[in-house]
Amino acid sequence: MAFKVFVDGQEGTTGLRLLDYLSQRDDIELLRIAEDRRKDPAERAKFLNAADVAFLCLPDVASREAVSLVDNPNTCIIDASTAFRTSDDWAYGLPELAPGQRERLRNSKRIAVPGCHASAFVLLMRPLVEAGIVPADYPITAFSLTGYSGGGKKMIADYLAADNPKLQSPRPYALALTHKHLPEMRVQSKLALPPIFTPVVGNFLKGLAVTIGLHPQHLASKVSPADIAKVFADYYQGEQFIRVAPADNVETLDNGFFDVQGANDTNRADLFVFGSDERMVVTARLDNLGKGAAGAAVQCMNVHLGVDEATSLHVEAPVKAEGPAHPVREAAPDFAT
């Protein structure tokens, strides 16, 4: 018997991606709401309560409203907004977070999908805090470079029009240092302080890399880049969607340059360490529309339903057929999520 799945907010980036992931599966029955009834609370409630799994791809306020419409105790809600990511009543949707996280995802009927920047940040920081290398009160500064697909249909259209020279260079944003991912970055990494976090949008569709600088002399213990890489490798041993590169591995670079888009079209996160015993950087790379959004949501669903965790997902990018891309179809405002 197929699992019944409903996507509330299927016209946005994450919703469209979810439909792409799920539409070819024979173990999923997609519940389709009529286009003219998508904003009808009564109709939405009917579909939400009929589903085994309901994905919410909505702004925070709308997600909270949708949750209030669900009274079926058997419906698992997987929410892609920022509304519940630090709530004790919701399982954080990062199966690789810590031992026991998959069990929590299997047992929970409320799952909060991590933000794209936060996913990369937490994958870097949680192992280092757990290992006692990075003190909880360490003053973290993080930089994230991301593609423009996170900015929604208008931003995608602006970049595709290519008539604004300002869009050709990287553009920092969220300079008030109040980005909506900060709470989950702090809580899920077990930090005492939120990081100083600067995201930057670049002139490419998708791909994301978060980089954090570390001064070993200010850490709880003196470590080398190789030590940090070993911590990552040990922490994520056996994780099919986490790939840890050897420290200072030049083979991961392109003539000395880092490829932010190297994990695109996968559900993979790649972790790197570069530097010396005096100073180093750690970097996590992922597809902001994959492991940073819809791919993570599907992975959580797979874990919850007890099916193969990799169903619908890719560790390596599939070979694409020839033909034009449709980037505008991948659009909805995600920088806030």
Swiss-Prot record:
Taxonomic superkingdom: Bacteria
Localization in the cell: Cytoplasm
Keywords from the named record: Amino-acid biosynthesis, Arginine biosynthesis, Cytoplasm, NADP, Oxidoreductase
SUPFAM superfamilies in the cross-refs: Glyceraldehyde-3-phosphate dehydrogenase-like, C-terminal domain, NAD(P)-binding Rossmann-fold domains
Catalysed reactions listed for this entry: N-acetyl-L-glutamate 5-semialdehyde + phosphate + NADP(+) = N-acetyl-L-glutamyl 5-phosphate + NADPH + H(+)
Top-rank EC class of the record's enzyme: oxidoreductase
Protein's pathway: Amino-acid biosynthesis; L-arginine biosynthesis; N(2)-acetyl-L-ornithine from L-glutamate: step 3/4
InterPro entries: AGPR_type-2, NAD(P)-bd_dom_sf, NAGSA_dehydrogenase, Semialdehyde_DH_NAD-bd
Catalytic residues, chain numbering: 116
Keyword Cell cycle: no
This enzyme's EC code(s): 1.2.1.38
Example of a GO biological process term: L-arginine biosynthetic process
GO CC term (a single one): cytoplasm
GO molecular function: N-acetyl-gamma-glutamyl-phosphate reductase activity; NAD binding
Function per UniProt: Catalyzes the NADPH-dependent reduction of N-acetyl-5-glutamyl phosphate to yield N-acetyl-L-glutamate 5-semialdehyde.
Entry's family note: Belongs to the NAGSA dehydrogenase family. Type 2 subfamily.
Designated name of the protein: N-acetyl-gamma-glutamyl-phosphate reductase
